[in-house]
């Protein structure tokens, strides 16, 4: 199991960011976390890389209790706000992340996000969508066993978004476990399984057909509202 989280709780002063979250993601699966902004998605992902320490619960990633340095080297993590060096070129940025993670071939990663032809461009001059794509390339350049993506396609045009999802599915088919957070319904529907999260609580999880059947609805948006208790 790539991710095993049981009863994870985290509180920031008056905010219960995570409230007894359970999550299980095997190798070879694209798992989507669907919820509005402030629902706990980012806190959960940050917990998985050791940036947030849960108050309670158990977290095991790639078979080890987190955080473990040797495990972190097998994880690719894309933050919601691209963490790039604006005064460096595209290829200098991805070379840096490849070295930090122990190596990797930058050309396939940049071609995956269609930035190979912009490799000499200064990162600070890129559009928001291009910076997002570069951040994704930096996360996957070392071919991680687990890929954690926090809102990975914000600002990316629909056609390229579909291509990126095709690429993520190909990575999963090769055994990579992928956890993707999103607040966009049609984006989340591309995942193999979904966890619906709100106010730090996992409302339900399953395939899209399973969630629709559970809520007795035909649309994922309606299912989310029903399971969240926001719709009679």
Predicted segments — roles?
Residues 147-151:
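Catalytic Walker B motif of ABC-type/P-loop ATPase nucleotide-binding domains
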Residues 95, 99-118:
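Conserved ABC ATPase "signature" region
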Residues 205-206:
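ABC ATPase "signature
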């Amino acid at each position: 199991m790539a991710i095993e989280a049981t009863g994870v709780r985290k509180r920031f002063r008056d905010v219960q960011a995570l409230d007894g979250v359970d999550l299980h993601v095997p190798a070879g699966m694209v798992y989507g976390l669907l919820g509005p902004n402030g629902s706990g998605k980012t806190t959960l992902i940050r917990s998985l890389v050791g940036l947030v320490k849960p108050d309670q619960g158990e977290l095991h990633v790639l078979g080890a209790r987190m955080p473990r340095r040797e495990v972190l080297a097998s994880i690719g993590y894309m933050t919601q706000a691209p963490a790039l060096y604006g005064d460096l070129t595209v290829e200098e940025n991805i070379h840096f992340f490849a070295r930090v993670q122990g190596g990797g071939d930058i050309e396939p990663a940049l071609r995956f996000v269609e930035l190979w032809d912009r490799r000499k461009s200064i990162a600070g001059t890129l559009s928001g969508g291009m910076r997002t794509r570069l951040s994704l390339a930096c996360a996957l350049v070392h071919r991680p066993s687990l890929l954690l993506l926090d809102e990975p396609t914000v600002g990316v045009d629909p056609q390229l978004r579909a291509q990126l999802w095709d690429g993520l599915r190909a990575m999963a088919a090769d055994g990579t476990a992928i956890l993707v957070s999103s607040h966009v319904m049609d984006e989340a529907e591309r995942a193999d399984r979904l966890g619906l999260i709100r106010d730090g609580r996992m409302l339900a999880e399953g395939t899209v057909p399973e969630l629709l059947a559970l809520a007795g609805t035909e649309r994922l948006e309606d299912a989310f509202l029903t399971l969240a208790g926001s719709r009679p």
